[in-house]
């Protein structure tokens, strides 16, 4: 073996170093979203670096490095003439003018989560949230729900995140066997809308806190579903859940500690008729806790954001659902890091 071959055979630190500075790439994407780069390219089409920089008000010093880094990260395309353009994914999901926009959640990550995650070490040592609560500010969500404009923006962002999973769920669950569903913690109603559009025989209920009503009802009108979906206000811990053949809980359970998770599952079971179903979907961690990186990191994000929330495995969710009285419980992968747990009453 030559010296070169011997050196190449040694373990390399490259992977460690790349992961250690992975925030470089994350922040590059988040800044691009903040600047509206993808929206500008969707509007103006492919353009050279200088023209794009002028439109975005960027200094020339690092302009090409910034754009070419996005090319290398797979977030932009560059043709032989040196013009930059959106990828198909960027055009669909990062253009603010499109209903498929998911950048709202990235905007929140940039403004809030990025600095909060700088306190992860403290969170790991104390077990305490590192968001606004840490600094003595009012709870983020209390302020959010008191500000109609900000609330609408947040709920639209959640729709962008949930829509792809909802479309898969619309075909993965036997909706033909049921006549009604209620989305618990419905936000704008994006998940509910996707299912109702795919299954015209269904009637839907959106269940969330009272300030959500105008945003939900506006979205149902936009989707042509105002006659098939109604809003029921309520607090799912303090009030009874609405009655429907199917209850859906998406991105809900991971916000809470185990006792609260179990309470919500018991309340869902009590609200369902015999033969009714509960569908829970989240970024469920694989049972071996080795593969679903997003789910595991999301659980760390719950440490940053909540007093007791955590993400969970499919096996854990099934056990909680059985303890709450559900039968024929199963877990089914949907798409990406997301899976659903289904149980019958």
Residue spans for each PLM region:
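Conserved Class I S-adenosyl-L-methionine-dependent methyltransferase catalytic core
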Residues: 6-7, 13-43, 54-179
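Alpha-helical subdomain
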Residues: 2-78, 175-345
């Amino acid at each position: 073996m030559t010296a070169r071959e011997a050196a190449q055979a040694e373990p390399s630190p490259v992977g460690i170093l790349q992961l250690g500075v992975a925030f470089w790439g994350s922040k590059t994407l988040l800044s691009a979203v903040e600047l509206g780069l993808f929206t500008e390219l969707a509007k103006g089409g492919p353009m050279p670096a200088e023209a794009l920089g002028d439109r975005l008000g960027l200094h020339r010093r690092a302009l090409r490095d910034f754009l070419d880094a996005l090319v290398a990260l797979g977030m932009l395309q560059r043709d032989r003439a040196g013009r930059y353009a959106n990828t198909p994914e960027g055009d669909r999901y990062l253009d603010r003018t499109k209903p498929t926009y998911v950048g709202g959640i990235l905007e929140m990550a940039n403004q809030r989560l990025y600095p909060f995650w700088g306190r992860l070490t403290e969170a790991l040592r104390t077990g305490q949230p590192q968001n606004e609560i840490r600094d003595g500010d009012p709870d983020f969500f209390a302020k959010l729900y008191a500000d109609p404009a900000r609330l609408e923006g947040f709920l639209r962002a959640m729709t962008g995140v949930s829509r792809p999973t909802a479309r898969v769920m619309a075909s993965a669950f036997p909706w033909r066997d049921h006549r009604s569903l209620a989305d618990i913690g419905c936000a704008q109603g994006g998940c509910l809308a996707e299912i109702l559009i795919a299954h015209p025989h269904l009637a839907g209920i959106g269940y969330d806190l009272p300030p959500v009503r105008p945003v939900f009802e506006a979205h149902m009108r936009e989707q042509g579903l105002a006659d098939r979906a109604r809003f029921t206000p309520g607090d799912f811990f303090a009030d009874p859940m609405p009655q429907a053949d199917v209850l859906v809980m998406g991105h809900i359970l991971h916000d809470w500690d185990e006792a609260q998770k179990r309470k919500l599952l018991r309340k869902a079971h009590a609200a369902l008729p015999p033969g009714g179903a509960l569908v829970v979907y989240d970024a469920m961690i694989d049972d071996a806790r080795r593969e679903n990186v997003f789910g595991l990191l999301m659980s760390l994000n719950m440490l940053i954001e909540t007093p007791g929330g955590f993400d969970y495995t499919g096996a854990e969710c099934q056990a909680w659902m059985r303890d709450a009285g559900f039968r024929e419980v199963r877990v089914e992968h949907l798409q990406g890091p997301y899976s659903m747990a289904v149980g019958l009453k």
